[in-house]
Amino acid sequence: MTSTKDKIEKLRKILLKYEYFYHTLNQSIISDAEYDYLFRQLYELELKNKELIPSDSPTQKVGSHILQKFKKIKHFSPMLSLENTFDVNGYLNFKKRIKKSIHNNEPLSFCCELKLDGVAISIIYEEGIFVRAATRGDGFEGENITSNARMIDSIPLKLKGIDIPKRLEIRGEVFMLKSNFIKLNKKYKLNQNKYFSNPRNAAAGSLRHIDPNITAERKLIFSCHGCDFFVKTNKELTTHYQRLMKCLSWGIPVNKEIVICSSDIEIIQFYKKIAQKRNFLDFDIDGIVIKVNSLELQKKIGSTTKSPRWAIAFKFSPKERITTLNDVKFQVGRTGVITPVAYFNPVYISGVMISKASLHNKNEIERLNLHFNDTITICRSGDVIPRLLNVIEIRRCDNAKKIIFPSFCPVCNTELLENIEEKLIRCHSGLTCDAQKKQALYHFFSKKSLYVVGLGPKIINELVEKGLVKNPIDFFYLKDIDLIQLKNVGKRKSIKIINSIKKCKKTTLKCFIYALGIPGVGEVVAGKIANYFIKLDKLMNSNILELNCISGVGKIISNNIFNYFSTISNREMVVKLIKQAGIFLNDQEIHKINSEKTYFFNKKIVLTGVFKSFSRIELKTILLSLGAKISNNISRKTDFLIYGNNFGSKFFRAKDLDVKIINQEELNSLIRIKEQ
């Protein structure tokens, strides 16, 4: 048995070594036939001695079970997106902002890398062993793709080398080579299946396939572009580049096209060099990424809620195609904004078929001087968003009809009004305009508002068209018999929707403000307004001066809020929602407490798990009333983690960082003491 064990271990080490050279260093030191022969030997030995198979064996990257669905998984820290620029001025403005946030005399160098056009994922290693992987998702929560990610040959299941942290997060891109993409589509053609439109879509579909064995067949590749150590390594690393090189030493693939630049000229030269090489690479890239190299400066510069301030994507100029304009349709948005949309003969750009593009506003139509049947140039801005660049006027017919922005709403025929300051044209009919009504109602009952399970756009559209609802109040008087008459709505679904409507009555001031759909008032601004006024009646009777005092609420949004509550019909609807429909705002029950004397005053708190005594919203409301600051992410600046049943990864992260942890019993005791 000992000799068999030794033979298995020897074969495993040899194969892992070959995989490291091939996937990480891009060096083939053995033929495919030799590799396959050794692999078969190991597989047959492990098959006879299953007790000797570790999780990091090369054979464990095949033969996994089929997943039924992908569960959601929370990231240890947000997976932020990058700010984009398409020209040198954008990069120079980025550098200027960085200089402002640090001392100008501090040395500044940048780590420049390729911006791979793939799927961003996060991988967690514990004690050097691969334990989980997740997609970016919404940045805070992604899909658990652990079983599929372990099928990617270039992702090591066990790290090698020294100074490996207790827990390590690796972030990077999963992509497919162009050559493999062509082979895959040829295979699909033979089997009469649908084509993948581009390598990125093929990689995304393969990564999320319900069968991990299919993922393994698709030959996906992973490349690391960043990492985070939850516990410091023995050797302190001070730069982003050092971290990447450390990852490389542990067997994690890192793209070799990385340079450290200390001047604008060096960065622009690297950009031009990569732009020239772009079409000769066997994988898609859409630019370069420029990152402040110093980790200390990265921390000092910080991030916004969307992107790090210390990094920017310098993207290549978009690809262009010529086509014919067929029509311009004018869409009415939720807040009445009229948006022109150009429809043209379909064109294929960067692997995607495009047939329409937003023209944004009246000024854009006038700038382009658009006529029907014009020959136009289309591009994908940032290789993503369709954009009408210009008109080739020399090809215009003599009798071509000019496209005119309408003076009346295309849906309700109300006269349109232009806001010069916002550069927007609106229909001010509100809920009497069917287009606004449908979108406003969907927004009112959406996930971040007063969420009603099962109440989607199709059901709302049909309810409006049948005259069953005209405003949010009507939904609270619906009966299951009203819903049953709709398409694809049976008794069971109707009862589910009615019950959900009843439950949504209990909400917070923040959600209620957001649900009203006031122009410019998103989720974050709604939260700031709720925290400032605490009570709805104070908000309804506020003036412009008070609104301007709220951090993050500018002049335009202040005017929008003031105008909304100055409109009699809006005030009447809000009052009816509270008094007649029975909407109950938890915030109105907050006890008047001198928050400065509480245990939680000015403390940064993170919640995890399910709580017995409170819903998550109720607990947040109570803690905010006690002067606490609620955060979604654990860091060294966190004061307390409060946990309930079924807690997640935040609990372990808090332990690693020595953050004070409070259970439900301690929490109840502290809240009771402080509310007395």
Curated annotation (Swiss-Prot):
Domain of life per record: Bacteria
Record: active site: K115 (n6-amp-lysine intermediate)
UniProt cofactor(s): Mg(2+); Mn(2+)
Reactions it catalyzes: NAD(+) + (deoxyribonucleotide)n-3'-hydroxyl + 5'-phospho-(deoxyribonucleotide)m = (deoxyribonucleotide)n+m + AMP + beta-nicotinamide D-nucleotide
Binding residue positions for NAD(+): D32, A33, E34, Y35, D36, S81, L82, E113, R136, E173, K291, K315
Residue ranges constituting the BRCT domain according to the UniProt record: 595-676
Entry's Gene Ontology BP terms: DNA repair; DNA replication
Positions annotated to bind Zn(2+): C409, C412, C427, C433
InterPro entries per UniProt: BRCT_dom, BRCT_dom_sf, DisA/LigA_HHH, DNA_ligase, DNA_ligase_AS, DNA_ligase_CS, DNAligase_adenylation, DNAligase_N
Identification of the protein by name: DNA ligase
The organism of origin for this protein: Buchnera aphidicola subsp. Acyrthosiphon pisum (strain Tuc7)
Gene that encodes the chain: ligA
